[in-house]
A protein has these predicted regions:
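C-terminal interaction appendages of subunits in large macromolecular complexes
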Residues: 1-185
């Protein structure tokens, strides 16, 4: 959608159609328009990604269902266990990986009387459940690396695709001309 809009109007506001990165592991992206605009313009910057979670009142546990792209379940579990051992997380009694066919899930059991919101804020501060993801759009153009913004990347990609289509058409035309030459004798 953004590529088509930029092709139609080179001055198109990219932020209006390209809202932000979409990570395979999911997570919640803190939307900072100025930082995102800087990344889109220069190809450098960072965004803050936070895990998605909910509170299971029946089991008195926090369920993390999406994690930042730059971390793993094991790293999160290890850091939580370290914090529990150091006495920094007295509200947490146990952490386990309940990932199955339904998807990712880290269950964090809370002690009675713990406030889930406050515990999650602590977890975001002390573990990889919240992380900064650095962007560096380093692209090879003509065999040389360049850092480019999104608009430049889209323009380079469009030019590359146009050249690919042109070369394919020239190749097909040559094959058809050779076949025509053989048929005509």
């Amino acid at each position: 959608e953004t590529t088509i809009a930029v092709l139609k109007n080179p001055k198109h506001d990219i932020l209006s159609t390209l809202k932000g990165p979409d990570f395979p592991g999911g997570g919640f992206l803190f939307y900072n328009e100025t930082e995102l605009q800087k990344i889109y313009d220069t190809g450098r910057g960072s965004v803050t990604v936070r895990a998605k979670w909910n509170y299971n009142k029946q089991d008195n546990c926090l369920e993390v269902t999406e994690i930042p792209y730059s971390t793993t379940i094991e790293a999160i579990k290890d850091k939580i266990v370290d914090c529990i051992k150091q006495g920094k997380l007295r509200e947490v009694s146990y952490v386990r990986d309940e990932t199955d066919i339904d998807g990712l899930k880290i269950a964090i059991d809370l002690k009675r009387g713990s406030d889930p919101e406050k515990v999650m804020q602590k977890l975001f501060r002390m573990t990889p459940l919240q992380d900064n993801y650095s962007c560096n759009f380093n692209i090879l153009v003509g065999g040389a690396p360049r850092v480019m913004g999104v608009r430049e990347i889209l323009e380079e990609w469009s030019a590359f695709r146009l050249e690919c289509v042109r070369r394919r058409l020239v190749f097909d035309l040559q094959k058809k001309q050779e076949k025509l030459h053989l048929l005509l004798g």
